From Swiss-Prot:
The gene is nuoN. One of its GO terms (cellular component) is plasma membrane. It is an enzyme of class 7 (translocase). It is found in: Cell inner membrane. The lineage of its organism: Bacteria, Pseudomonadati, Pseudomonadota, Alphaproteobacteria, Rhodospirillales. This is NADH-quinone oxidoreductase subunit N. Keywords: Cell inner membrane, Cell membrane, Membrane, NAD, Quinone, Translocase, Transmembrane, Transmembrane helix, Transport, Ubiquinone.
Length: 487
């Protein structure tokens, strides 16, 4: 029987589920086109969920016999996901109206995907993890192929669905191996078994290690880490641009936070075993992301490889396996959110004679035709490249310092080298905007929502340098929850 008290930690998720179903009904029963009104209500629902998440406070609460956990780490991660989803929904409205593909299902799917992400972040058992992951994935498959009259979008959705199903299979196989050898799917149960705090502690054998590797492979696909990144460039390029902006931020943050919880929870005592795998994936992601982006001509494909590189940097912090490492990861993800939504606001404003353009060369002479847009893009590109004193530099600084503290010197040096390589393609965009002659100006006006997103993201990136304390302290408090002994 479910106690009323048991439902308190799950209030934000219950609210999101009820809101999603209510808005689905509203969209169906309204006679006229309801995309705009449903989108506004979805943004309000995401805001209300944010209030509910923050009202839970920082104490650790569990629900459904320990399947679900709400703590400071979950609160921080859910905050990032809700902000990313709200911004993505706001940015998509003008695009859907211009392209005449506005349907009320779009914002509702974003809401359900976000609900899945929140469930993933709070999962305290592999069954709950899979439930949240699949709810998110099913909504994202539909969003990828949302523009069904476009062959590229349909192809993107199909590729994502086929490869996503394969990744889910790998993940489930890993979970079944872990259950077979350990006898439990609970994070706390597994942690006790490996830590020796159980009547019959077990040593990590080949079955456990194989299960762990399969789980890592399944989750690596969800964050598009090398070598499970094949889908990302095609899906990012083929999907409608607002969908790409959503894919690049919210699901990635949720999956990386889930990976943090899995690695530091049930497998905290197997750090030496999983660190090798995570280090390999991190190095691959950083270098493949950096070198592949150099040759791209389409800005959405470039952003796909850029995000693969960023995942590599985040994995450096996870490989450190310490409070400092996870603090660095959370700071990096918060900065990554604003860098990406700002860059996608510029990409969504790339219109010539009413149609979207996606070539890097189309940005030529932007400093002369749209000086403010060029300034925003330049700040964001410098930040992504990790140029001090911008926020992007500090994000990398924290994860590399954590890696050095954990003795991962080679990983840190390779990370810095790949960061130097990535500087080339970010600065190439700045060079095209400021030193190339304009071919054709972008359409004006840019739109209120885009201008607002560009302004806020630029202010956040510049302000972090001056006042880093709020983010750094909240990230530290969230990270310490996962390491109670070190806290």
């Amino acid at each position: 029987m479910i106690k009323t008290l048991d439902l308190v930690p799950v209030l934000p998720e219950i609210f999101m589920a009820v809101a999603g179903l209510a808005l689905l009904m509203l969209g169906v029963f309204r006679k006229e086109d309801s995309t705009k009104s449903v989108s506004v209500l979805v943004i309000l629902a995401l805001g209300a969920a944010m209030v509910l998440v923050s009202s839970l406070g920082g104490e650790r609460l569990t629900a459904f016999n320990g399947l679900f956990v709400a703590d400071r780490f979950a609160g921080f991660a859910k905050g990032l996901v809700l902000v990313a989803s709200a911004i993505a929904t706001a940015m998509s409205l003008p695009y859907l109206e211009r392209e005449k593909i506005g349907r009320f299902e779009y914002p509702v799917l974003v809401l359900f995907a976000t609900l899945g992400m929140m469930m993933m972040i709070s999962a305290n058992d592999f069954i709950a993890l899979y439930l949240g992951l699949e709810l998110q994935s099913l909504a994202l498959y539909v969003l990828a192929a949302y523009n069904r009259d476009n062959a590229r979008a349909t192809e993107a959705g199909l590729k994502y669905f086929v490869l996503g199903s394969l990744a889910s299979g790998l993940l489930l196989y890993g979970i079944s191996l872990l259950y077979g050898f350990a006898g439990t799917t609970s994070f706390e149960g597994l942690a006790n078994l490996f830590a020796g705090g159980h009547d019959h502690p077990i040593k990590p054998n080949m079955g456990i290690i194989a299960g762990l590797v399969f789980v890592l492979a399944g989750l690596s696909f969800k964050v598009s880490a090398v070598p499970f990144h094949m889908w990302a460039p095609d899906v990012y390029e083929g999907a409608p641009t607002p969908v790409t902006s959503f894919f690049a931020v919210a699901p990635k943050i949720a999956a990386l936070c889930l990976l943090v919880r899995v690695m530091t929870g049930p497998f905290a005592d197997l750090v030496e075993q999983w660190r090798q795998v995570v280090t390999f994936i991190a190095i691959g992601s950083m270098f493949v992301g950096s070198f592949a982006a150099v040759v791209q001509t389409n800005i959405k494909r470039l952003m796909a490889y850029s995000s693969i590189g960023h995942v590599g940097f985040v994995l450096v912090g996870i490989a450190a396996g310490s409070t400092l490492g996870i603090q660095g990861v959370l700071i990096y993800l918060a900065i990554y959110l604003f860098m990406n939504v700002g860059a996608f606001a510029v990409i969504l404003s790339m219109r010539q004679k009413g149609r979207m353009v996606e070539g890097i060369d189309d940005l030529a002479g932007l400093s002369k035709t749209h000086p403010m847009m060029a300034f925003v893009m330049a700040v964001l590109m410098f930040s992504m490249a990790g140029v001090p004193p911008l926020a992007g530099f500090w994000g990398k600084f924290y994860v590399f310092m954590a890696a050095i503290e954990s003795g991962l010197y080679t990983l840190s040096i390779l990370g810095v080298l790949s960061s130097v390589v990535s500087t080339y393609y970010y600065l190439r965009i700045v060079k095209v905007m400021y030193f190339d002659e304009p071919v054709e100006a972008f359409d004006k006006p840019v739109g209120t929502s885009m201008t607002l997103v560009m302004a806020v993201s630029t202010i956040v990136i510049l302000a972090f340098t001056l006042i880093p304390a709020p983010l750094v302290t909240s990230a530290k408090a969230a990270a310490q929850v996962l390491f109670p002994a070190a806290g």
